């Protein structure tokens, strides 16, 4: 599941820099829906165009923020080692009555680098088009505009262009995150399914060079990131005679 939450500038930048890995919230009805493995998209209160995506790795339940502060490492909450947190600090934001009613929650998180893919698919990137354009072109059976980097991403190290490098997936774990992300994973499946509907089995006639090779790299990557999903191998079978991209396999070390 993907949750949307807002943050003030200071905690937003602490999470972005990696100096804060536990977000504190009242355990109200909305927060009770959060589960380990879910994703949270944080947007900054005073600039909602600034966003980042994290994955939930653990949930810490307490009766009050004072208990939470006493139990969890202050560095994970975002305090420097030479700072002593005030146990009553959160009372100004969440009165004691609400803490007693709902309980409180420490959401332990891991920063991902998926937000750039979400942003590019929503709004385009530089001269590249958005996901809806990409899907429309695949339904019309011909790639016309530019969007390949963030719709069919490759493993890091295969390309030297700015966009290729920027939108590269750094390793197998990040590919698994991408596939598990409720928006990115669903879109990857949706647009990949369109490829199987093509009458042609020649990727060059659809994507041209070098994008046809990028699609093969992408299919190879996600074949290993999501081995339970047969879709990616089916595309390799259709367009590449079942042959994986050797360079992707080498980088993955599989």
What is the predicted function of each stretch?
Residues 44-49, 151:
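Short, charged beta-turn/beta-strand-edge "cap" motif at the junction between a beta-strand
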Residues 35, 112-213:
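Conserved, aromatic- and glycine-enriched, well-ordered alpha/beta core segments
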Residues 189-254:
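A charged, amphipathic interaction segment
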Residues 67-112:
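Contiguous surface segments at macromolecular interaction interfaces
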Residues 37-45:
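Short conserved beta-strand and strand-loop elements enriched in small hydrophobics
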Residues 50-61:
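Short beta-strand-centered aromatic/proline hotspots
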Residues 1-36, 111:
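Compositionally biased, charged N-terminal/linker segments
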Residues 59-69:
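Short, solvent-exposed beta-strand-terminating loops
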């Amino acid at each position: 599941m993907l949750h949307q939450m807002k943050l003030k500038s200071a905690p937003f930048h602490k999470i972005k820099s990696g100096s804060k890995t536990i977000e504190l919230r009242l355990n109200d009805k909305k927060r009770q829906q959060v589960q380990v493995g879910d994703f949270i998209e944080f947007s900054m209160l005073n600039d909602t165009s600034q966003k980042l995506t994290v994955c939930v790795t653990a949930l810490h339940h307490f009766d009050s923020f004072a208990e939470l502060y006493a139990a969890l490492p202050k560095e994970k909450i975002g305090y420097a080692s030479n700072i002593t947190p005030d146990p009553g600090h959160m009372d100004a934001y969440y009165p004691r009555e609400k803490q007693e009613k709902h309980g409180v929650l420490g959401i332990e998180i891991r920063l991902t680098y998926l937000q750039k893919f979400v942003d590019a698919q929503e709004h385009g990137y530089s001269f590249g088009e958005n996901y809806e354009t990409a899907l429309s072109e695949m339904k019309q059976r011909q790639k016309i505009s530019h969007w390949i980097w963030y719709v069919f991403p490759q493993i890091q190290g295969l390309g030297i262009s700015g966009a290729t490098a920027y939108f590269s997936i750094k390793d197998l774990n990040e590919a698994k995150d991408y596939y598990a992300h409720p928006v990115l994973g669903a879109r990857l499946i949706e647009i990949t399914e369109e490829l199987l509907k093509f009458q042609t089995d020649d990727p060059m006639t659809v994507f041209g060079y070098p994008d046809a090779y990028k699609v093969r790299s992408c299919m190879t990557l996600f074949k290993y990131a999501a081995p339970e999903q047969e879709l990616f191998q089916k595309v390799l079978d259709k367009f590449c005679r079942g042959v994986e991209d050797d360079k992707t396999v080498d980088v993955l070390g599989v």
